[in-house]
C-alpha cells in the first residue's frame, strides 16, 4: 500500500512522518544511543507543539481544498454541462 492509503490522514505530514520513521528505524538499528536521542528529541514540547500545530492547520487547508473542489465540480456540472 502507498503511504496515503496506509495512514488515511488528511494532513500533509504523511510523507515527512514516513521518512522520519524510516530514518529513525535505520539509525536505531545501527546506533541505539543516537536512536534514543532522536526519540527523546521528538518529544520535546516545542517540537510536539509545532508538529501538532502544522497537522491541525494543514488538515484545515485540506478540508477547504476538498470543499472548493466539490463546489467547482458542482459549478462545472450545472453551469457548463447543464446537469441539474
Swiss-Prot record:
GO molecular function: enzyme inhibitor activity; nutrient reservoir activity
Cellular-component GO terms for this entry: chylomicron; very-low-density lipoprotein particle
Keywords for this protein: Storage protein, VLDL
One Pfam family cited in the UniProt record for this chain: Apo-VLDL-II
Domain of life: Eukaryota
UniProt-listed GO biological process terms: lipid metabolic process
SUBUNIT field: Monomer.
Family membership: Belongs to the apovitellenin family.
Cited function: Protein component of the very low density lipoprotein (VLDL) of egg-laying females. Potent lipoprotein lipase inhibitor, preventing the loss of triglycerides from VLDL on their way from the liver to the growing oocytes.
Descriptive protein name: Apovitellenin-1
Phylogenetic classification of the source organism: Eukaryota, Metazoa, Chordata, Craniata, Vertebrata
Amino acid at each position: 500500500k502507498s503511504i496515503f492509503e496506509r495512514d488515511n490522514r488528511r494532513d500533509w505530514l504523511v510523507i515527512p512522518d514516513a521518512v522520519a520513521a524510516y530514518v529513525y528505524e535505520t539509525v536505531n538499528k545501527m546506533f541505539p544511543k543516537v536512536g534514543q536521542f532522536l526519540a527523546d528529541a521528538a518529544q520535546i514540547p516545542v517540537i510536539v507543539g509545532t508538529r501538532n500545530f502544522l497537522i491541525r492547520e494543514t488538515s484545515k487547508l485540506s478540508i477547504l481544498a476538498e470543499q472548493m473542489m466539490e463546489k467547482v465540480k458542482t459549478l462545472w456540472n450545472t453551469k457548463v454541462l447543464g446537469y441539474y
